[in-house]
């Protein structure tokens, strides 16, 4: 065997084993995004609130990501939700007040999650008048647009 064979054979074996190995499944994190309405950080003990003890929320906050510096770009419920869903300011996403109708055809983070293979759902207050899009399952409170 010549010198080139000593180099070529091991490299070929390594290359073939790399090609034949199965693709390792990438572990994706579970994502639970909780959005509440009209309460301050004082309403949860994980943010230092003393009036209420919220041990289950505390556990979720301690084991996951707790957002400590979040600011609403619109003070109204519906428009604020539309901004969070789209990542766009109200004048760009078209939902400027609580009487607006949300255009669900635009890109939203639930649609991006679906495209990445996640199952998505929303339960509770929607407040965007139209039916939710980008969710595999939804169960929303109806009539929220009249409440302002």
Describe the function of each predicted region.
Residues 2-8, 12-148:
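Formylglycine-dependent sulfatase
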């Amino acid at each position: 065997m010549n010198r080139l064979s000593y180099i070529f054979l091991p490299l070929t074996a390594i290359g073939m084993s790399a090609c034949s190995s199965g693709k390792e499944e990438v572990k994706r994190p579970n994502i639970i995004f909780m959005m509440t309405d009209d309460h301050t950080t004082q309403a949860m003990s994980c943010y230092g609130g003393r009036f209420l003890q919220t041990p289950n929320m505390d556990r979720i906050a301690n084991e996951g990501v707790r957002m400590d510096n979040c600011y609403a770009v619109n003070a109204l419920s519906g428009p604020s939700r539309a901004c969070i869903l789209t990542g766009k300011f109200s004048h760009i996403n078209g939902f400027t007040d609580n009487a607006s109708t949300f255009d669900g055809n635009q890109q939203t983070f639930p649609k991006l999650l679906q495209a990445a293979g996640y199952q998505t759902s929303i339960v509770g207050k929607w407040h965007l008048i139209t039916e939710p899009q980008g969710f595999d399952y939804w169960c929303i409170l109806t009539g929220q647009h009249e409440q302002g």
